[in-house]
Amino acid sequence: MRHGNGYRKLNRTASHRKAMFANMAASLIEHEQIVTTLPKAKEIRPIVEKLVTLGKRGDLHARRQAISAIRDVKLVAKLFDTLAARYATRNGGYIRIMKAGFRAGDNAPLAVVEFVERDVDAKGKADRARVEAEAAAEADAA
């Protein structure tokens, strides 16, 4: 019997839900910490945990499965190289969900989703690199 084995629909179609979870998983892998609503956080946990387990498996089939799930080759490379090595000795429990109060506009419960033992410098790394590149380009132009 499959009683109680459902999932949250989150008022979205199946394709929208699948795309949203793929985007959230990609953002979490890239930044290693995201802020979202609590129901979305609870739904994204098993998806990302399975992706990290695929990364730990490390073979070509696992890599192709991860690419089909998150659609970004650079993030899959990070998943298989950086994150898989970081969690090589840990059997599950790669994600932490912490309650973060309520959103101002609609009072929705918020949660911080982050990797356990995360790299603090990963959040905002692309933004910092972009700002430094723009500053260097301006210095060269001047």
Curated annotation (Swiss-Prot):
SUPFAM superfamilies: Prokaryotic ribosomal protein L17 (SSF64263)
Keyword Ribosomal protein: yes
Domain of life: Bacteria
Entry GO terms, CC: cytosolic large ribosomal subunit
GO biological process: translation
PROSITE patterns in the record: RIBOSOMAL_L17
UniProt keyword annotations, A-Z: Ribonucleoprotein, Ribosomal protein
InterPro entries cross-referenced by the UniProt entry: Ribosomal_bL17, Ribosomal_bL17_CS, Ribosomal_bL17_sf
GO terms of molecular function: structural constituent of ribosome
Quaternary structure and partners: Part of the 50S ribosomal subunit. Contacts protein L32.
Family: Belongs to the bacterial ribosomal protein bL17 family.
Protein name: Large ribosomal subunit protein bL17
Organism lineage: Bacteria, Pseudomonadati, Pseudomonadota, Alphaproteobacteria, Hyphomicrobiales
Gene symbol of the encoding locus: rplQ
